[in-house]
Structure formats: structure tokens, C-alpha cells
């Protein structure tokens, strides 16, 4: 068929769009009874459209083709691929089954089915499907490779490695089998074995980039960043225009040197502009960049995401990056096209992307979502616990007869960081009569004065810039702690996974994460009477309930030298200024529309965003648009671009409006410390109650609303109450000091008392 050959030639020249248009026009010209050879035209049209990133269009073409060519295995297999891209997984599995039933030699469909089952972590079904594939196509290395991945998911490393070895024996040149074999060792912290596997693979495939990339991955996972950097630097000396080497060097050094890393990311996308993975990692790095003009980096990161989205569908781990950056810019119109709450969350959990679940909290809308995200955390936790079973550490026992309780605090944020704002009372007021305190940090930065101060206050401060998870757990276990608190979760440079190894007899999480982490190995989560969910099934851990407050405002983040202007903004300006300093990942269309409702109820009022993003053109555009769409004029929306030195801008706000469902925490405390009251919306889960706790423990519990309408009403009422706002501006700091939130010494006493009680009861 000459036309088809012409179209395939066009595609080979990079003109896939034009080729697809020609095929579509030819098919349409043949009417309802196309000739027999049109089957191939339908197939290639759907394939091209699918590769152009239009799975819905491909599915539509395939549905018409299946109506004409019944039980065609190629069309059915491609239909399964289209359904998979559309995340219609059950439908995809059905198409793959139909294709294999139609023709038992259609093992490509069976392989696609097995791969999808592995990706869905339906490991038992994947084993059955892979065994069928193995029988149908015994020389296909994909079958034992799928078996290896399925057994790996079941925590059976022995069988997983057996099947991976079988796969590489069947075809020593099969790159994916080698990569999966290497990743299995790496995931189970068997770094020496992983390096041996890499060396064997390189002998078989000395020029294969993906194997060399696996070598770099092993170095990084083993904490051998310098070895990885040196290897890549040598490679770039030999081939300075190697896009892959620039990209991998950026991946290796960006966490330590963001500016130098970005230069290599930029060079990688210049050399290979059609690689969406390169663009997404560059975007992610720009989004984290603090040097120079941060707003320029934020804007450039957003533009890099938009470029990546033009290059086709993104894998789920890159959807996570795209989602975070798009939410940051207020592009909720694009975010809703990326996938459902359930599908995305489970995909991220299955890929061990715990930090993605943190950002997912703000997308919760219903009770079903609350339990769903809890299950997503459990999925992540089960995977991490499974990794420890084949190379376990013995769980330490409580030491009896020791004079003092040995308390551990693990966080890479024991430095100038919001975590230390609230942790500092524990170091300022150590109960030395009863406790020895050990700290553990994996921070990659050199010690700042705050870290140096904390180190001077505790018995031991163990600081390691690069250490593997199991090694970190073993280091902690050797200290024979009685109880260990984890304060960082999955935020940058922290090692939540260490808690899966049971490094202490009793363990707890606090401060760094507003939800159960997901690990059954963590015994407690620190709460207070306000933050503790009314439904205990919304937590995985037992409640470690403080008598009054879960935090206190220490001297570090709440400096009396921060000046409060004596005259409230509305008296100076003639209008009410609402505002927020909350992170935009907590924003949603519902949050913005509720804030807009408040402005509509308070004539001439304005809204002030105090955020680093405020200097980015896209942020200003889409935040303003959200208010304009609700009937609020654009000139009522104000922006101040600032990082770090934002406290003075509370002098320009009359009232802070909180985010929901994930509320503020640090920002709520900062706002009221500056005399600016906060209106919050209280929900049922932990992350929906942070501000409720802070306000209640500051004597402002009446500012907590329990419905959207109540939120608007309380904001409007407070805007009208000039007398109260004037009083709070001058008196709120004193009021806080008389309440639990402002009493760090009492907080430290309550904390140490509760730890002592818990440890002594366990003994």
C-alpha cells in the first residue's frame, strides 16, 4: 500500500503529525466499507497518535477499527496500551487478554499484561501471567524478568535474584534485565553486590548508557557521590557534548551545589531538547534553587515543565514533579488532567515517593480521600519494611538499670530551619538529671551556628553528610537509645526510611510531617488534645499526647526584635488587607474561591501574597486570575516576593487567611507572633488541625471555623471588629506568653515527663 509506505517514511523523517493526518484523511475517504488493507492504516494511525501523546484519540480510532476487524490481536494489543495510558487499567488488562486468546502466539500482548500487573503491584497475578508467558515464549527474557520484579514486590529477594539471573543468562545483552537485577540489590541496601552486578553488565554492554547510568545510580544510593562525580567528570573531558553525562553529573551534584548542577542540566537540555526527563529534572532543580534571583528560577522551572508536557506523557515520578510546580503556579486546570487522587497517590506510594504523598495531603477533599491517603502511606510503609527483612538489624532492647534515659532526635533540620524553631526548647531546657540526648543529622551543608549550638548542648551529635539508610540505622542502634524521635520525614536530606530498621526500642515521629508516616515500625506520633484526630483510625501510630500543646514557640524563630508597627494596616491605608505567607502547595481552587468570597464580603479589601513565588510572572498571573474569576478586581491582589525575611510584611496584613485542608503551622505561629490573627478551617485529620492547635493554645480558639461558610463569616466579623484587631496587634505577644504555645520551658518539661513515663512503662 503506497500511501502507508509514504506515511511511514514521513514518520521516519520526524513528521509524525503530518503522517497521521494523511492516514486519517485516507481512511475517511474510504467511507464505511474500507478495503482490507485499511486495517494496517488504522493500526499505524492509532500507533502514531498514541506516540504523539493523544491516548484518547488513539482509543477512539481503535474502537472504530475493532468494529471492522474483529478479534485482531494487534489492534487489541494496541487498544490495551491506549487504555493503560488513559489509566483505565482493568480495561487494558481485558484487551491484552482478548489479544492473547485471539492468537496464542501474540505474546507481546501477554508481556504487556504482565508488565501492567507488575506496575500495579498485583504480584500474585503477575507471577501467574509471567509463568504463562514463560511457557508460551521460553526464550523471552521478559518472562523471568517479570517474575523477578513480582517476587521482589513480595519481599522475596532470593527468588527475585534467581529469576533476574535467569533473564540475563537467556540474553546477556538485555539491558532492562540487568538494570532490574542491579536495582534489586540496591533497593535492599546490598551495595557491594550491586556494584559487582554493574561490573558484569558493563563487560557485556560496555557502551550502553543505561548500564553506565545504573553504575552512577548505585554510587549515589551507596552515598558515594564523589566517586560518581569523578567518573562523570572524566567522561565529560573525553566527550564535552555528551548530553547524558551532563545530565548525570547534574543529578549527582545538584543537591550539594545547585548553581553548578543547573549549568549541567541546562547544557543537557540544550544538547537533547526532546527529552522530557531531562526537562523535568531541570525544572525540579530550578524550583529548588535559592541562589541569585529565586523568582527567576521559579519561573524558569515552570516554563521547563510546560516544555516537558509538550513532549508526551510523563512517567508517574515526573508527574509528581510537574504537579508540584504547576500547583505552585496555580495551574489547577492542567493539574486535574494529570490523574486521579487515588491513582496518582498509589503510583507514587508504589514507587517509594513519600515526599509526593506530603504534597498530596492538600488535595484531600472527602472522608474517602482521608482514608485513601492513609492507605497510600501504608503502601509506602509496607514496601520500605519489606526491604529490611532480608538484611535486617536486630531491634534493640530497652536497657534496664541505667541511671538516665537515652533519648535520640533524628533530623537533618537541626540548623536554621523551621523545625528547629520548635525543637529548640528541648535543647535549651534539657532535663539533665534524667536524660542523655543524642542527635543524628544527615545534612549535606556545613554546620551553621544553630547546629553548632545544638551540638554543644547534647551528649552526642552524630553528623554524616552521606550515609546509606541501613548504615544510619546501625549507627543509631549502637548508641543503645531508649527512645528515638524522627523530626524530618521525607523532606530534603532527611531519612525517614531509617525508621523501618527499628533502630531503637521505642520510636516516635514529631514535627516534620503532619500525618502518619506510613511505617508500622514507628510506635508513636506526638499530638495534643486539639491536633489529635477525633477518629483514631486516621492515625497508624499510637498517640503520644502532650497535655497542652504539641509545640511551643522557641526563641529561635520568634525573635522579640521583630518590630510590630503600632498602627494596624487598615487604619494606615483605609482598607482591610487579608493575606497569606503559606506555601502554595497548600492552595487549591476551593481555597482561592473561599478567600475570594471573603474579599467580596468586605468592600475595598485587598489580598496580599507574601511568597518567593510572588516575583514569578506565572504565579502573579494565575493567582490574580483565580480572584478575578470569582468577581474580585485584579487591582485588589497584591504581591511581595520575599524569602526568609518575610516577618516584616505581617505589618501590612490585618488578617491572615489559612489554607485548607492542610493548614499552616509555622506560618500560623509567625502571624500571631506579629499580632496578626488567623482564620482557620478545622477538619478531622491531623494535617487539618495544626492551626486549630496553635490558635487554641494561644487563646484564639474562637478564630477556628468548622465550615466554609463559618470561615467566611469569622473573617468578615473580625474585619469589622477594629477594636479587637487593634488590641491584638499590641497585646497578642504578651497573651501568647501566658498560654501553652508561648511557654517553651513548660513545653520541654511536659515533653521530658511524657518520654520518661513512656519509657518507664515499657521497661
Where are these regions (language model features)?
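Short hydrophobic beta-strand element within catalytic cores of glycosyltransferases
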Residues: 677-686
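Short alpha-helix at the nucleotide-sugar/activated-sugar donor binding site of glycosyltransferases
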Residues: 672-673, 696
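Donor-sugar nucleotide-binding helix/loop cap in glycosyltransferases
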Residues: 657, 671
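Short acidic/histidine- and often glycine-rich active-site loop of Leloir-type glycosyltransferases
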Residues: 688-699, 704
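Short Ser/Thr-rich beta->loop micro-motif in glycosyltransferases that lines
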Residues: 488, 658-664, 682
Amino acid at each position: 500500500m503506497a500511501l502507508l509506505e509514504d506515511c511511514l517514511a514521513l514518520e521516519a523523517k520526524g513528521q509524525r503529525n503530518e503522517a497521521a493526518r494523511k492516514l486519517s484523511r485516507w481512511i475517511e475517504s474510504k467511507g464505511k466499507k474500507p478495503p482490507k488493507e485499511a486495517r494496517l492504516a488504522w493500526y499505524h494511525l492509532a500507533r502514531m497518535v498514541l506516540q504523539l501523546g493523544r491516548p484518547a484519540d488513539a482509543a477512539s480510532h481503535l474502537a472504530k477499527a475493532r468494529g471492522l476487524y474483529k478479534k485482531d490481536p494487534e489492534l487489541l494489543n494496541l487498544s490495551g496500551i491506549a487504555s493503560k495510558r488513559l489509566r483505565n487499567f482493568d480495561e487494558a488488562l481485558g484487551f491484552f487478554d482478548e489479544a492473547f486468546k485471539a492468537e496464542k502466539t501474540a505474546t507481546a500482548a501477554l508481556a504487556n499484561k504482565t508488565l501492567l500487573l507488575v506496575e500495579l503491584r498485583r504480584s500474585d497475578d503477575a507471577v501467574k501471567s509471567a509463568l504463562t508467558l514463560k511457557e508460551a515464549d521460553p526464550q523471552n527474557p521478559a518472562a523471568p524478568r517479570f517474575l523477578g520484579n513480582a517476587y521482589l514486590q513480595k519481599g522475596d529477594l532470593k527468588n527475585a535474584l534467581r529469576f533476574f539471573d535467569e533473564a540475563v543468562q537467556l540474553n546477556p545483552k538485555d539491558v532492562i534485565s540487568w538494570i532490574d537485577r542491579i536495582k534489586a540489590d540496591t533497593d535492599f541496601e546490598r551495595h557491594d553486590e550491586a556494584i559487582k552486578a554493574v561490573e558484569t553488565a558493563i563487560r557485556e554492554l560496555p557502551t550502553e548508557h543505561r548500564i553506565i547510568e545504573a553504575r552512577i545510580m548505585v554510587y549515589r544510593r551507596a552515598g558515594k557521590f564523589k566517586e560518581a562525580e569523578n567518573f562523570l567528570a572524566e567522561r565529560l573531558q573525553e566527550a564535552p557534548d555528551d548530553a547524558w553525562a551532563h545530565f548525570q553529573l547534574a543529578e549527582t551534584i545538584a543537591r550539594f551545589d545547585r548553581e553548578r548542577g543547573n549549568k549541567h542540566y541546562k547544557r543537557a537540555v540544550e544538547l537533547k531538547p526532546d527529552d522530557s526527563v531531562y526537562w523535568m529534572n531541570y525544572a525540579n532543580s530550578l524550583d529548588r534553587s535559592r541562589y541569585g534571583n529565586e523568582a527567576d528560577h521559579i519561573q524558569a522551572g515552570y516554563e521547563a515543565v510546560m516544555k516537558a508536557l509538550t513532549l508526551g506523557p510523563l512517567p508517574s515520578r515526573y508527574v509528581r514533579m510537574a504537579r508540584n510546580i504547576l500547583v505552585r503556579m496555580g495551574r489547577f486546570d492542567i493539574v486535574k488532567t494529570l490523574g486521579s487522587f487515588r491513582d496518582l497517590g498509589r503510583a507514587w506510594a508504589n514507587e517509594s515517593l513519600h515526599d509526593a504523598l506530603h504534597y498530596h495531603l492538600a488535595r484531600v477533599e472527602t472522608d474517602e480521600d482521608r482514608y485513601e491517603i492513609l492507605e497510600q502511606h501504608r503502601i509506602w510503609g509496607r514496601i520500605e519494611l519489606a526491604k529490611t527483612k532480608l538484611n535486617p538489624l536486630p531491634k534493640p532492647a530497652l536497657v534496664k538499670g541505667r541511671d538516665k534515659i537515652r533519648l535520640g532526635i533524628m533530623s537533618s533540620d537541626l540548623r536554621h530551619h523551621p523545625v528547629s524553631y520548635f525543637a529548640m526548647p528541648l535543647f535549651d531546657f534539657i532535663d539533665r538529671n534524667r536524660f542523655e540526648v543524642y542527635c543524628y543529622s544527615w545534612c549535606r551543608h556545613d554546620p551553621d551556628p544553630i547546629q553548632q549550638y545544638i551540638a554543644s548542648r547534647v551528649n552526642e551529635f552524630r553528623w554524616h553528610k552521606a550515609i546509606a539508610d541501613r548504615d544510619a540505622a546501625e549507627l543509631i542502634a549502637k548508641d543503645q537509645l531508649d527512645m528515638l524521635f524522627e523530626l524530618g520525614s521525607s523532606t530534603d536530606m532527611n531519612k525517614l526510611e531509617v525508621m523501618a530498621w527499628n533502630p531503637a526500642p521505642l520510636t516516635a515521629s514529631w514535627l516534620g510531617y503532619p500525618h502518619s508516616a506510613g511505617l508500622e515500625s514507628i510506635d508513636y506520633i506526638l499530638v495534643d488534645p486539639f491536633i489529635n484526630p477525633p477518629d483514631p483510625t486516621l492515625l497508624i501510630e499510637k498517640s503520644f499526647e502532650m497535655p497542652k500543646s504539641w509545640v511551643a514557640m522557641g526563641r529561635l524563630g520568634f525573635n522579640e526584635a521583630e518590630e510590630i508597627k503600632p498602627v494596624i494596616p487598615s487604619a494606615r491605608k483605609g482598607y482591610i488587607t487579608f493575606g497569606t505567607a503559606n506555601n502554595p502547595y497548600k492552595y487549591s481552587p476551593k481555597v482561592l474561591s473561599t478567600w475570594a468570597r471573603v474579599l467580596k464580603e468586605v468592600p475595598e479589601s485587598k489580598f496580599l501574597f507574601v511568597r518567593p513565588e510572588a516575583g514569578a510572572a506565572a504565579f502573579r498571573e494565575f493567582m490574580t486570575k483565580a480572584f478575578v474569576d470569582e468577581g474580585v478586581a485584579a487591582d485588589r491582589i497584591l504581591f511581595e516576593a520575599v524569602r526568609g525575611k518575610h516577618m516584616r510584611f505581617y505589618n501590612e496584613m490585618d488578617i491572615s487567611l489559612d489554607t485548607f485542608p492542610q493548614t499552616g503551622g509555622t506560618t500560623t505561629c509567625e502571624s500571631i507572633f506579629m499580632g496578626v490573627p488567623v482564620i482557620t478551617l478545622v477538619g478531622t485529620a491531623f494535617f487539618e488541625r495544626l492551626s486549630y492547635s496553635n490558635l487554641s493554645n494561644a487563646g484564639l480558639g474562637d478564630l477556628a471555623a468548622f465550615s466554609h461558610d463559618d470561615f467566611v463569616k469569622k473573617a468578615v466579623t473580625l474585619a469589622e471588629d477594629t477594636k479587637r484587631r487593634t488590641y491584638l496587634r499590641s497585646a497578642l505577644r504578651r497573651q501568647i506568653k501566658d498560654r501553652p504555645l508561648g511557654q517553651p520551658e513548660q513545653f520541654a518539661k511536659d515533653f521530658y515527663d511524657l518520654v520518661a513515663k513512656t519509657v518507664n512503662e515499657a521497661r
